[in-house]
Amino acid sequence: MKKIISLILAFTMLLGATFALSSCGLFGDDTPETEKIYVQTNAYFAPFEYYDGTKIVGVDVEIMEMVGEKLNKEIVWQDGDFGIIIDTVKEGKLADCGAAGLTITDERKEKVDFSDPYYTSIQYVILPADSDVATKTTDGVEYIVWEALAGKTIATQTDTTGWIYTDGEINATKDNDYGYAGVLYGTDTKHVEMDSANVAAETLGLTIDAVIVDELPAKYIVANSAKDFKCYPLYYSGEEGQADSPVEEQYAIAVTKGNTELLDAINEVLATLLVKGEDGKTEIEKMVMTHMGMND
């Protein structure tokens, strides 16, 4: 009896060992676990990334999912503060890349590699519908120049391009690293930092006079808010007879330096998405329209 029990136990242990080895791929199972690409974002920047229920969707999401398919890797989205995205990608430990409507800047290029640009945006100003901020019109385009915001309280999302521009125009003097005086320096203009442009917009007309944010998020907020807002492009006044000009920027995806496989794959995907179709529109432009709810 003891011998039979011993044989049963031995057989059971052999089966367990065989299962463990086959689970480790040592018995010809050559199907590897799907590798993952970790993407940092801040999902409050529609139409590029935003929540649809509990799921993150948007233009950047579609782009990166195509990259995942190309490399046969799973895309894992990490939603966090916008201000930590570049540094997190730089370290390369918790994230492989960042996709959050990121503007290419020289300072950021010192920390990360950028993909080819895939969208050109300009800064916009969101105002209450009854705002007294003056506008200008040139060639049929109604816009606001920085000087019109003098003495106002302006809100921006921390560490965004809007934040960078606003901080510089209010605080820059010729004696610091900027090398020039900000347009709003000395005008008693106040700058309030907030977690998102959406949160800032909720205070418009109360403690905030204007919100500065990128064009499409501005239009998305105005179109989807229960409150009555309006928005205009933000321009710099022309000097010495030159025309006024918009505050422009280009979006790209940030990648940890040295990760050429991922960077190349992103650029290859973007190259296909930036080809204009028979209708004269790129796939990126069509994605933008879809997520703005503007499809025909």
Feature locations, PLM:
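Short glycine-rich His-centered loop
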Residues: 34-59
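Short helix-initiation/N-cap motifs at beta->coil->alpha
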Residues: 76-89, 141, 177-202
